[in-house]
Amino acid sequence: MLQATTTISNKLGLHARASAKLTKLAGGFPCEIWMTKGERRVNAKSIMGVMMLAAGIGSELTIDTEGDQAQEALDALLALIADKFGEGE
């Protein structure tokens, strides 16, 4: 299993549009992808699960990937979050 911790830095946090981008990206990989915030762990391929994290700006998330293309998935998700989901703020 691969794991990385990142911080949500876009102004609106992990809102509906950002969650949709994240789950769409995650769904394109065959591996398992989990996200954790505090005590809550969710499947990153589930938009409802991701939105339930209620990750606002400054929230720290841990991403776990396991299986085929785990490294590629982790790198892609970290890049999306670092790019502020393409929102520029």
Predicted feature locations:
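Intrinsic-disorder/low-complexity, polar/charged segments enriched in Ser/Thr/Lys/Arg/Asp/Glu/Gln
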Residues: M1-T5, E60
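Compact, glycine-rich, soluble single-domain proteins
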Residues: T7-I57
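C-terminal structural segments of small proteins and small subunits
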Residues: G56-E89
